[in-house]
Amino acid sequence: MQESRFIQKKRVLVTGGAGFIGSLLCDRLLAAGHKVICLDNFFTGTRENIQPLLDNINFELIRHDITFPIFLEVDRVFNLACPASPIHYQYNPIKTLKTNILGTLNMLGLAKRVKARILHASTSEVYGDPHVHPQTEDYWGNVNPIGIRSCYDEGKRAAETLMMDYKREQNVDSKIIRIFNTYGPNMRADDGRVVSNFIVQALTGQDITIYGDGRQTRSFCYVDDLVDVMLRMMEKDNFCGPVNTGNPDEFTILELAEKVVAMTGSKSKLVFKPLPQDDPTQRRPDISLAKKELGWEPKVNLKAGLEKTIPYFENWLAHNTKEVKS
């Protein structure tokens, strides 16, 4: 991060601040001396994620759903609120759409009123099942608008449109990042994402569930690297994005499963199930723009990131064994 640009202390709003990425972003902002307001409705966020922050005098927690307006005085808005794993956003697709559209509208309205800079956390899902590889920001994507994932994919695309329209028409200082697969501490064990699934299954001796033949690819970014680029993007003047934020190292799902099994010493077997509808076959970011405009590229490779993530889940399982299905 351009630390010198962020020395002036600010009031920072983080929507979805009790979630996986949001909680770690709040922690980093507090460490830099900022006043942080964490907004979360606790649909997927957890109090456990922010428990260590509650005694900090610069931290304020507000239980609130951003589909309803809120009036606050802030300098910066990180808009992260939205369920981000298929198991959660498909559970309530209409709510997911409302969060992306009404929630983003409300945060843009707030940013306009108080003249705050706002950064929207979009997603690689705006590219759908891409025909271009790796994906660059000028690729418009290949999204099924009526599929079971569309509440998230199209919701995020609509939110990007709102961000750009408010910038063009209302002069709101808005920014967009497109987050690719991210993992690390504070992930939920039950969120259905591939890294958390594989680690929990391996640590508990369950079969490792691979959907499809395992040859589909993903790129995995460790969460500390993501928080770094979010902070850089927020403080970068005269650049609104969108910009890809992810690790360009590409792995097959089968390679990930084998790596997790080896690193945990698990005796779990690999089992294969049908690939879900609209599940992308390839996903890898081109981060040339992030390198050029933000001077950023990820530092943590997959092995090093897993070495930090596996102990988190070991500790979580030691205290939450009843919540894990056998």
Please name every model-derived segment.
Residues M1-T182, D224, V300, K308, ...:
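N-terminal Rossmann-like NAD(P)+-binding domain of SDR-like oxidoreductases, especially those catalyzing
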Residues C151, A159, D191, I253, ...:
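Conserved donor sugar-nucleotide recognition element shared by glycan-biosynthetic enzymes
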Residues H133, A189-N197:
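A glycine/serine/threonine-rich, flexible loop-to-helix segment
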Residues Y91-N92, N186-D191:
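Short, solvent-exposed loop/turn segments at secondary-structure boundaries
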Residues M1-F6, L25, H64, N106, ...:
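C-terminal substrate-binding subdomain of Rossmann-fold SDR/epimerase-dehydratase oxidoreductases
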Residues A158, L162, Y166, F198, ...:
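Hydrophobic alpha-helix immediately C-terminal to the catalytic Tyr-X-X-X-Lys motif of short-chain
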Residues L97, M187-R188, S219-Y222:
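Nucleotide-sugar-dependent glycosyltransferase donor-binding/catalytic pocket residues
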